[in-house]
Amino acid sequence: MKIAIGCDHIVTDTKIAVSDFLKAKGYEILDVGTYDFTRTHYPIFGKKVGEAVMSNQADLGICICGTGVGITNAVNKVPGIRSALVRDMTTALYAKEELNANVIGFGGKITGEFLICDIAAAFIEAHYHPTEDNEQLIEKINQVEKQHPEQQDAHFFDEFLDKWQRGVYHD
């Protein structure tokens, strides 16, 4: 199984630790960045994880930023992605087994590294339990999605990257 993983600059070390843990368990990892601690913007990497999953470059995805809120919201904007921000095993398993989540999000400054590793492994190993109710709920969620063609523009995030460089945003 191949797992796409992405993060912002605040939690690169956590992403590397989770990647190494999953590799040791035998999973193939597609690391979409960021790769260092140079200031960047989390939506870029949420989008990359979501696109990797939806293009079948990866089976599932993991997103990590400081709180997990921003990157999980960003990945959920990719059509077809069902991501859940989790901090505990129960929520992660519910997301996968009941809602067929294909990406999981974490706050690397909120949830400890070892717990993230354990939750990620359980999420990956869990299986969706299709029921009529689950299928109907997922279909309702899918109906909310809308395609936004401007997101395909290679310069879609330039405005935000420029603001990072000018110091508008702060960690």
From Swiss-Prot:
Transmembrane segments: none annotated. It is an enzyme of class 5 (isomerase). Pathway: Carbohydrate metabolism; D-galactose 6-phosphate degradation; D-tagatose 6-phosphate from D-galactose 6-phosphate: step 1/1. It catalyses: aldehydo-D-galactose 6-phosphate = keto-D-tagatose 6-phosphate. InterPro entries: LacB, RpiB_LacA_LacB, RpiB_LacA_LacB_sf. GO terms for molecular function: galactose-6-phosphate isomerase activity; ribose-5-phosphate isomerase activity. Its EC number is 5.3.1.26. Keywords: Isomerase, Lactose metabolism. It holds the Pfam family LacAB_rpiB. Signal peptide: none annotated. GO terms for biological process: D-allose catabolic process; galactose catabolic process; lactose catabolic process via tagatose-6-phosphate; pentose-phosphate shunt, non-oxidative branch. SUPFAM superfamilies: Ribose/Galactose isomerase RpiB/AlsB. The keyword Isomerase applies. HAMAP family: LacB (MF_01556). Heteromultimeric protein consisting of LacA and LacB. Belongs to the LacAB/RpiB family. PANTHER family: DNA DAMAGE-REPAIR_TOLERATION PROTEIN DRT102, RIBOSE-5-PHOSPHATE ISOMERASE B. This is Galactose-6-phosphate isomerase subunit LacB. The lineage of its organism: Bacteria, Bacillati, Bacillota, Bacilli, Lactobacillales. The gene is lacB.
